[in-house]
Structures are given as structure tokens and as C-alpha cells.
Amino acid sequence: MHFIGRKQELEALEVAFRGAAHSPSRMTVVTGRRRVGKTTLIRESTKDKPSVTWFMTAATEKDLVARLTQATVSALGSIVPEGLTTFAGLFEALMIYARHHHFSLVMDEFQNLAKVNSGLFARIQDIWDSNKDQTHMHLILCGSSYSMMKKIFEDNREPLFGRATTKIHLQPFAADKLISLVEQAPVKISNDDLLALYSITGGVALYVADFVDNGIFHKEQMFEWTVRPGSLFLSEGYDLLRLEVEAGQSTYISILRALAHGQTQAPRIA
């Protein structure tokens, strides 16, 4: 599926990038539910600009730094001093590079840094505050766990509270955007088909793309595609719950399973 919409969000990212050309650096936080298109939006925004993307995974800090160093060298060249093994050291190296270079640094799934080293947010804050006024970096911090990202950037007890200069909360596509998309479909689509598309996907970008990219445009096809073995929809509820709720997952899953089996009385659900 080709890139559609997001005009306001692209403009906000463009303004932040242009602003970083002149000190100080800019920090943009991009949030939104899983599958809504955050990474695609950022990729579209940075595709013709100097940039490096770091994908954060739950790994040892040493292994993560080794992988992020490779990504940095591939994107920007050999700008990282040899022997770096800490995330703070790598981030500081890029801030130093940003004193004389204008570029974007994207940290995707940023909340996962807490699983690597819980003290990294404080180190990022310290390095950012010490260097942002003399540098030209557009730092884009993106995450799918809304609860975690909200805590990191909106809890006044957290190190990165108040640091973002731009905040983008990406929403699913509205119905009018889906209409403009399906108008380009190779087959005629009825209002019932459009209603089914919006009802099933909620306008979530990846779900819409799953139908469009596979030529699924009619409601009967959509229903069959959604429940077929291997459908991405079958595990989405569990995956979303696991992403947002770390403690007590089994309890919530048991409650949902009981409801799905028709239980309506509290003693039976519990």
C-alpha cells in the first residue's frame, strides 16, 4: 500500500527538522497504538534527509550498542570512536557529530531502553541538556507502548519530562482517508465494503494494508481473510495486552477468555 495522508504530521516533522538546522537541536516524540504507522511516517519524513535509525530491542547493553554502531556507520560513515560499549557513550558521540552536521536520529521503540538499563533515560537527559544548544540534531523518539511513553515524557518525576519540543500522537486513518484509498482500487467497491473495511480495521494502517496489498476489497473476502489460519488479527488482542500490561497479564487474559466463552457473572469470570 502506498503512503497516504499524514500531511499535518509530515509538516510537523519537517518544521522540527528545519529548526534543528539552527541551534538548538529539536526533540520530537511520536506515539500511537501498535500498527498505526509511526515507523512508516518517520521513514517517509526522513527518506531524503541525512538520518540514522536505531531500533531498540531488549538485549544486553553491549550487544545493543554493537548493533546500533553498525547502523550508524552504515548511515553516516565512520563517525563513532572505536571501543564504545555503552549506550550513553554512543549517544554522546552522535551529539558531538551534530555540532557540525545537521541530521535526524530516530530511536524506534524507545521505551525498550528501560529493559536494557533503567538508568539510560537519565543519561540521555544529561547528554541532551549539555549539548542541545550547540548542536543540529533532530532527535525523534518513537514508541508503541502508550502507557510507557506517556510515563517517560509526561511524568514530572521522569528525567525526560519537558524535553520534547514537538509531540505527535498518531491516530488511525479517518473514514475519508480510506475512501480516497479505495477509490484507487482495481475493482468497484460498495458502501458496504467500505463500512466493513473501516469496521474491521478501525483505520489502523497495517490492518488496512493487509487487505489492500492482498487484493481483499469485498466484505465477504474481508471476513474470511480476518479469521483464516495465520491471520495477523487472531493474535493482535493478546499482543496489545502484553505490550501495555506487564504485571498481571495472566489475570486479564483469563478474564477476557471467560467473557469470550459467554461467562457474564462475576464469580464465574473471577
How does the language model describe each region?
Residues 1-270:
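Phosphate-binding site recognition
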